[in-house]
């Protein structure tokens, strides 16, 4: 029996999309997938509809390595409205409490300090975390509050930008799993006035260059240009993609000779020189350093395959 025909293109890489405000991460993901006519696509860490900024979208085989971006650090710029608390901790929610803003500059500085470093955070009910197989925001929309455990996070930097009237602007560099809305809500309670997010922009994810971000409008413009020029849209779109192994760029590289990579790609651990003593590694083959997957150093010092790239026929 012949294999079913694959729909769309076998295109592999990571697009750094500048997500627009007012759209869900899944909505923009589906638009990018259609624009690229890609077989597979997935994003790495959803942004709220209110938020804008860097949303890495993995296409094709790059989706196998998206988990490594979920685990990476991120940087945000956030503006909070002081004096009002909402049920979602952002401007999309309903105001549930209003209080005067009376704190001093010293009290603000002291409160901000408590959010720096290793802290614990109780996730918002309006999050995609699951409880008994159901997303928290689904419970919240039904008016049901369920128990949530505090989770360890790290805030590497919490920079004060400005405080004007009832607006507070901050920049946050944080670890995976950090909810900026929750930081703002908790900060508002610590200051005694309440607060919610009115503006949120993700500035960076991992070490991806900011100047490689593109908008949906730019992608659509390139498609129109390609049509006018009589060339395939892929000719203008594909150069925008980052390499498929870029989500795992923080991991060391182990290069295998072609004689060893054959065994590795067949699921077998192989011995090689220059490998670290333990941990995950990016594995390449041959003199051109072609990426073939992720490996892990086993107890015998061999490189064992963990996620492999599939070579699709052209």
From Swiss-Prot:
Positions annotated as active site in the UniProt record: 48 (nucleophile)
One GO BP: tRNA pseudouridine synthesis
Protein's name according to its UniProt entry: tRNA pseudouridine synthase B
Catalytic activity reported: uridine(55) in tRNA = pseudouridine(55) in tRNA
Family: Belongs to the pseudouridine synthase TruB family. Type 1 subfamily.
Enzyme Commission number(s) from the entry: 5.4.99.25
Molecular function via GO: RNA binding; tRNA pseudouridine(55) synthase activity
Function of the molecule: Responsible for synthesis of pseudouridine from uracil-55 in the psi GC loop of transfer RNAs.
